[in-house]
Amino acid sequence: MIQSFLKQVSTKPELIILVLMVMIIAMLIIPLPTYLVDFLIGLNIVLAILVFMGSFYIERILSFSTFPSVLLITTLFRLALSISTSRLILVDADAGKIITTFGQFVIGDSLAVGFVIFSIVTVVQFIVITKGSERVAEVAARFSLDGMPGKQMSIDADLKAGIIDAAGAKERRSILERESQLYGSFDGAMKFIKGDAIAGIIIIFVNLIGGISVGMSQHGMSLSGALSTYTILTIGDGLVSQIPALLISISAGFIVTRVNGDSDNMGRNIMSQIFGNPFVLIVTSALALAIGMLPGFPFFVFFLIAVTLTALFYYKKVVEKEKSLSESDSSGYTGTFDIDNSHDSSLAMIENLDAISSETVPLILLFAENKINANDMEGLIERIRSQFFIDYGVRLPTILYRTSNELKVDDIVLLINEVRADSFNIYFDKVCITDENGDIDALGIPVVSTSYNERVISWVDVSYTENLTNIDAKIKSAQDEFYHQLSQALLNNINEIFGIQETKNMLDQFENRYPDLLKEVFRHVTIQRISEVLQRLLGENISVRNLKLIMESLALWAPREKDVITLVEHVRASLSRYICSKIAVSGEIKVVMLSGYIEDAIRKGIRQTSGGSFLNMDIEVSDEVMETLAHALRELRNAKKNFVLLVSVDIRRFVKRLIDNRFKSILVISYAEIDEAYTINVLKTI
């Protein structure tokens, strides 16, 4: 029979709960022997500890969604157990070893001390923990219900924007509904704890007063004997009931005060957040030391605390820094291997391969060996990331730097996703001049010339800075020139750095300030199209920091225009003032215009399809137009004139694509992007 029952339990674990409920009902009616009461008291304590530990280690509130039901069952079990122990106390003046031991241990030689300790435990549970948890549950339930419509709308918006699919939306709605029901259940379930605490107090007085009366009238005890016996039993019974109740109350407090969204358990979150800020640790350490110096205070106690906090401070600042560096080293494998004609294998070996992420490292800079100082380079990279965000509104991923024995002293190589993307010649011990000046040769200043994107860069020793200032040469530091070249390389490959996930992260922050605007944009544009718009803007050196203006433009034009390329042109027109401010000099924009013949030739080559528009010119016409443009643009470049190409709005993107291979650094703008506050200086019409 037992074997059959165990087999049923293994397939139907709910039978355990059913048996427990039947046992609780039986405890209300049937008198129990003391040894069985001891077992049930021990079971009650262990169950309370089990619930306490379970609530402590949950990672989100839905991980313990059965807690209100568990709370009801444990409360009923505890009250039924109190009835059984009260029956034993009043009838036999004996409630088992556990209750007697608890009472004797707490009371000791003083009944007054025992009452005080028991009163403190009861007050802490009833007034502090239970009342606080009850209030938190009430507020959480109200806010959960009030926030449901907004959360439902957010799920619908994500579904329309293509961020989630129908299955994901269904799962989110299910989670939202379960959370709302759970918070509502908590609001009522906390009344169980409150009622249990009140019932426990009443049972204590009944056992004490009734026990003394029964002891004197039925058991022939003296007043002092009855008072001593029943006080020990009453306080012992109260403690074995209140301690599990206290653990359950704390468990309820843990769950209702937990904030959803954290991936770790509560203990880990508490430790990481309290001790996560090194500055707080060192300040607290100093204050602890100062308190220890006050007259009459035990200095050694506070000194020990201060030393512990200081040790934690150094652990955070030094050990974790080294740990982060080692983790960044192992985040991806950037090594190479060579295969030669020898018989020996030269395949690379990676230690602990399974622990390494399969993702590539987004950005790596390779320097020549013995060329970089770690502290200086970390500072420079952080300044580059900060300036790039200021200039273009994009947060770059962490940039790692490595050394290579294959590079020349002043060579730097940029790897994007561990593949070579660009290289630079930067002389960090010199200054650079970006415009050629004949007076430099006349002064006899030694110059090292390099080029980047058709720009000739002259590098001069720092000692000649004063001489260069006297001839009005445009001087730039090596760090600034490195940032300029690196930023251009990053923008040329922006599609690999800034994609849908980065766009989503940016829009999540934007939604906190402009939720209605973003909701309107998502009605007509998916996040994929928004990402493409931002990529195209960044690819032509246009900042996306003014995201509000970009979203306003998308909200205006997206309902009428489905072609992403055309949408970009409308966004560029809305950013005209910012585009002009970047290319103008003293309020003037120097431009080169295209003749009607060339514009018509390009316009005739545009083809419209369901997938969008593209340029498909005849080879002869394309070569003729390209040669004409190349010849004229090269002449202007040789004349050292800074200019942009000004064309009609309908062909701007196609002209940019046409000249991109030969003249990538030349900006192409349309008439719609000229702000009325700026004047146009036409250098030439091609």
Curated annotation (Swiss-Prot):
One Pfam family linked to the record: FHIPEP
Any one GO cellular component localisation term in the record: plasma membrane
Cystine connections: none
Locations listed in the record: Cell inner membrane
GO biological process: one example: protein secretion
Record field: transmembrane: 28-52, 105-129, 197-216, 232-256, 274-292, 299-315
Membrane topology: Multi-pass membrane protein
Keyword tags: Cell inner membrane, Cell membrane, Membrane, Plasmid, Protein transport, Transmembrane, Transmembrane helix, Transport, Virulence
Function according to Swiss-Prot or TrEMBL: Necessary for the secretion of IPA invasins.
Family, as annotated: Belongs to the FHIPEP (flagella/HR/invasion proteins export pore) family.
PANTHER family to which the protein is assigned, alphabetical: FLAGELLAR EXPORT PROTEIN, MEMBRANE FLHA SUBUNIT-RELATED (PTHR30161), INVASION PROTEIN INVA (PTHR30161:SF2)
Protein's UniProt name: Protein MxiA
Lineage of the species this protein comes from: Bacteria, Pseudomonadati, Pseudomonadota, Gammaproteobacteria, Enterobacterales
